[in-house]
Regions:
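A short hydrophobic beta-strand element
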Residues: 78-88
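Short, cysteine-centered beta-strand-loop-beta hairpins and adjacent loop/turn segments enriched
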Residues: 90-97
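Short beta-strand edge/turn micro-motifs at domain boundaries
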Residues: 104-126
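A solvent-exposed, acidic/Ser-Thr-rich amphipathic alpha-helical stretch
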Residues: 30-80
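Short, low-complexity N-terminal intrinsically disordered segments enriched in polar/charged residues
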Residues: 1-31, 129-130
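Short beta-strand segments enriched in hydrophobic/aromatic residues
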Residues: 29, 88-90, 119
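Residue-level signal for well-ordered, solvent-exposed loop/turn and beta-edge residues enriched
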Residues: 34, 95, 111-113
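Short, surface-exposed coil-to-beta transition loops
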Residues: 68-70, 97-103
């Protein structure tokens, strides 16, 4: 079975995030994307619109002094949905974390319209992000 084209688009998006390539992310994210960041920390909330999501990314890097990193392991996708499995690492104030993460996406015409990030260790995530 051939790989769905959205798998490659999602993989490219994670690679672009790692490089800070916002041109690729601009193409991947719908203008009206909604990004859901769960937990009970300073980054928790719903970010509406591409610019708000990019602001969230900037804050994420600021809070972790640029140590936030995603190691992508698997991507599944079809026309309407995407799932990415990854390991996230970050450090802040002398504390470090490594956590498994599952990201779920709604897609329309190859663009991410909604995104949920879910950590297997939400308490550690909250501790790192304060």
């Amino acid at each position: 079975m051939a790989e769905h084209p959205n798998v490659a688009r999602i993989r490219d998006g994670y690679a672009a995030f790692a490089k800070g390539d916002f041109d690729v992310l601009t193409d991947l994210f719908a203008d009206n994307i909604v990004w859901h960041s769960g937990g009970r920390n300073q980054l928790t909330g719903d970010y509406r619109g591409r610019e708000a999501v990019f602001g969230y990314f900037a804050r994420l890097m600021e809070v972790t002094d640029g140590t936030f990193h995603i190691d992508l392991h698997a991507v599944l996708a079809d026309d309407e949905h995407g799932v990415a499995l990854a390991i996230v690492t970050a450090s802040r104030n002398g504390k470090s974390m490594t956590a498994n993460e599952a990201d779920v996406m709604h897609l329309r015409d190859g663009r991410v319209t909604e995104f949920w990030t879910t950590s297997a260790d939400p308490y550690t995530v909250d501790e790192i992000f304060g």
